[in-house]
Amino acid sequence: MCNIAGYIGYERAAPKLFEMMEKQEGLGGGFYTGIATIHQGKLYYRKVIGDVARLLDKTDAATLPGTMGIIHSRTKSGGDVEWGHPFVNEKENMAYIANGAGGFFEKIRNKDAIAQALSDAGHIFRSRTPGATGNYPRFSDGSSAHVSDVMCHLIESFILECGGPAEAMRKAFIEFPSEIVGLMIHTDTPDCIIASRINQPLMIGRDENSTYLATTAMAFPDLNWINPMPTTSTATIYQNSINILPFESIDYSVASIFPWEKSYNRVMTLLSNGSAKTLAELMKETNEFWPKNEVSQSAMMVYEILRHLKRSNKIRFLSSTVEGVDKDIDAPRTQAVLNRLR
C-alpha cells in the first residue's frame, strides 16, 4: 500500500499536497516521496528516498509553482530513488502516480510482455535496473523496471494513438489491469487531474474553490462534500467539476457490497486489548470477509472504518518511526489504538 493525493484550485498546490500527505504517509508509505505540479505549460517534479520532511529538506519542492498537482508516498518495496513516484515520460510533459499491486490480476496479466513491447518501441524507463527487483516487470535482458513506470509509458503510447490523456489512461487501465488507483497530470490538459480507479481507495473532496483527492478523507481539510471515486472508471477532475467515464468490456467485477459489520467488529476486537495496529495488520485480518471471485475493496473499507472511529473519538493514532530504505533514513509509521473510557 502507498498513499496518494491531488489538488486543483485557486491556491498554490504544493503546500496543500504536503499537508495532505503528512496526515496519511505513516499509514501506507513514507519510504519514498515525490510531487509533481504544472505551471504555465511546464511540468515540475521532485522525489527522494524518505518522507515528506526529507523531500522538503533535500529539494526545493516547497517552492514548486502551480495550482494543480499530485503527490505520492511509497512503501519499502525495492529500488533506488528512480523507483519513487512520480514517473514521467521522456518529454517530461506528463507525470503518473499509483497505489496498489497486481493482486487479483497477477496471474492473468502479462506485465513482462507489455514492458518488453514498450521497450522495443523505443520507450526509455528511468527505473530500469540490471537484474530482477521483487515481482516487478522484467525485460528479455534480465533487467527490471517499476510497474508504474511501465504504466506511465503505456498511457503515453495510447495518447499517441488516441489523442486525449483521459481516454489513453482509461484504455491503459483496461488493457493492463491491477489492483490499483492512479493519478496523472499532463501539460496538454493543464486544467485537470486525471484519475483511474479499479479498486484501491481514492476519496474526492470539494469546497467552493477547489477539488481535493487522497487515499483517505482523513487527509482532507474540513470539507462539506466528500465521496469515494467509483471503481472501474476514469475521472477527469477540474477545479469546479468532475466527469466520470466507466470502463467497458472488462471480464471481472469489483465487490460493491462491503462486509462492514464483520470487519468493524474484527477491528474493534483487535484493538480491544490495548494493542496498536497498523492499517496493513487490520486489512490482513479482514480480508477473509470478501468474496474470493471478486476484486475486494479491503483498503477502502478499513480506511473508512478508521475514519469513522477517529471522528467518533473511539481511537487515536500513534506516530513512530521505523528503519527506512537506507539505515540512516527513518520512515514514519502510524498505528491505531483504542481510546479507553474514563
Residues covered by each model-derived region:
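Conserved short alpha-helical segments that host acidic/polar catalytic motifs at enzyme active sites
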Residues: 1-342
